[in-house]
């Protein structure tokens, strides 16, 4: 198989990270560590112009994410503009700040889909992880309200060593809430999750037990039909081959940060690569011609063993961001891959997961005070 320049199709999926503001303090958040340094946010008009350009290029799905997107008072206006342009719209939220009135406003504006996240299946653990004693009951109330309005009930639980052992109770909660889709997503170690990896990475035994529980529920639900879909996402750290991150670098996905930086994946801003701003270039130029979006497209950039690997068209060399975090060089093969000369870093992380005694109170939580430790501002 020869190296080649990729055929560049338009971005089908646009993620609008509206703000880094958030009322919760989850220690596994994927936001950048120095988010407190990023105080500027695109205006309503600037976001709508981004949507217009993306739709003109062929984008069809628009996700509203953050921080917590509900803190943006112009969210109904942004939803309505996206709907008028023809996007399928998705709100990814903690549910904190949501009300039945807001839900109705979003429905009237044309919002298609809402995903609510939980930290755990019980109030005590949820509060410990979110940094909010009131969060759990608010999430329960809003999940029921979402269902009552006729939206698909989509719940997300981020799993890690402190809550994965209650996965049966998590699934039971989803059944109780009459969820249509449930994402049981084991922590992916970027942003704050990478910072807290030693205290969050489950053991292999925990993962295996959780997989067994999920399979048992799938078999049961195949009979009674209580859940349409139960998705269990395992961590990269227990795989021997890397995932094809975002379907390939600059292949189908574009993220725009609160201040307007365009990225080919959520975590790319940490790389020593200059990424363009939507305030300086239009999206067509950014997608097709910018250095940042072309840096890891195709496979000509790949080192060995990726360059000669028959799986390179499947995994695209893995995650450049993960390679950078674990080796200091994004050009290296993703250490998750057993063929990588840096795979030992993954093996060491697995071993550390077996030894660690770190409790929840020893994690570094995602908040303004901790974020300021990572920049001089």
Swiss-Prot record:
Interacts with PqqD. The interaction is necessary for activity of PqqE. InterPro entries: 4Fe4S-binding_SPASM_dom, Aldolase_TIM, Elp3/MiaA/NifB-like_rSAM, MoaA_NifB_PqqE_Fe-S-bd_CS, PQQ_synth_PqqE_bac, PqqE-like, Radical_SAM_PqqE_MftC-like, rSAM. The gene is pqqE. The keyword Oxidoreductase applies. One of its GO terms (molecular function) is 4 iron, 4 sulfur cluster binding. Binds 1 [4Fe-4S] cluster. The cluster is coordinated with 3 cysteines and an exchangeable S-adenosyl-L-methionine. This is PqqA peptide cyclase. It holds the Pfam family SPASM. Its cofactor is [4Fe-4S] cluster. Its EC number is 1.21.98.4. [4Fe-4S] cluster binds at residues 22, 26, 29. PANTHER family: PQQA PEPTIDE CYCLASE, RADICAL SAM DOMAIN PROTEIN. Keywords: 4Fe-4S, Iron, Iron-sulfur, Metal-binding, Oxidoreductase, PQQ biosynthesis, S-adenosyl-L-methionine. One of its GO terms (biological process) is pyrroloquinoline quinone biosynthetic process. Pathway: Cofactor biosynthesis; pyrroloquinoline quinone biosynthesis. Belongs to the radical SAM superfamily. PqqE family. It catalyses: [PQQ precursor protein] + S-adenosyl-L-methionine = E-Y cross-linked-[PQQ precursor protein] + 5'-deoxyadenosine + L-methionine + H(+).
